[in-house]
Amino acid sequence: MAAALRSSCAAARRLLRISPAALSTLTAASSRPAAVAPLARPIAAAAVSGGNNAFSWNLRRLFSSNEKHLPAISDPEVESAFKDLMAASWTGLPDSLVIEAKKAASKATDDKAGKEALLNVFRAAEACEEFGGVLVTLRMALDDLCGITGENVGPLPGYIEDAVKSAYKRYMKYLESFGPEENYLRKKVENELGTKMIHLKMRCSGVGSEWGKITLIGTSGISGSYVELRA
């Protein structure tokens, strides 16, 4: 399993991955052909297509209670892409949102700090999308082992147990990589991945007490809720 070290701003290094060998064994052992499908990028039906439609304006208004916790961004285009990313679900990033973010991140602007904040959020979104797919694949493998009604419940095979433990370590190390000034981003990641981690916990008895650190809604310490932002 690769190490997950980062410098203070190097969000690109925060890739959450179970080791290739473990994932290869996991997907090969799962009897469900579509097990690796979550790693693909679906096109969402209700995509956030840009900064000028009514849906995008509603998302901006929902950010009002959290403005003081977000980085200051002076460039309007960069700010719009940043807020649209924060308000979107990272389970499947819409292509239109990816295009918007890349366009804003590649433009020439004097707002270097705002551009860096956008890049950090975009990298985190892509990492969560990828790792979320791995967690779904792992959950599906557990479901296949247990059976529809739990008739096959028994000790976990070693490769599954190793994958579950690896997923937990990757998740916690990723959260710990965020600095105090990135609390808003940490909470967003908790929101996106916490539920998927809880799904794994629910399917495995005897997990360590450290799993109690995983929260379903990571909004403690900030006003408002990112769940509301995606409503």
Curated annotation (Swiss-Prot):
Point out the transit peptide region.
Answer: 1-63
The subcellular location is: Mitochondrion inner membrane
InterPro entries per record: SDH5
The membrane-topology field of this record reads: Peripheral membrane protein
Q: Which GO terms describe its cellular component?
A: mitochondrial inner membrane; respiratory chain complex II (succinate dehydrogenase)
Q: Major location, coarse class?
A: mitochondrion
Which GO biological process entries does UniProt record here? tricarboxylic acid cycle
Q: In which pathway does it act?
A: Carbohydrate metabolism; tricarboxylic acid cycle
**What is this protein identified as?**
Succinate dehydrogenase subunit 5, mitochondrial
The record's gene field reads SDH5
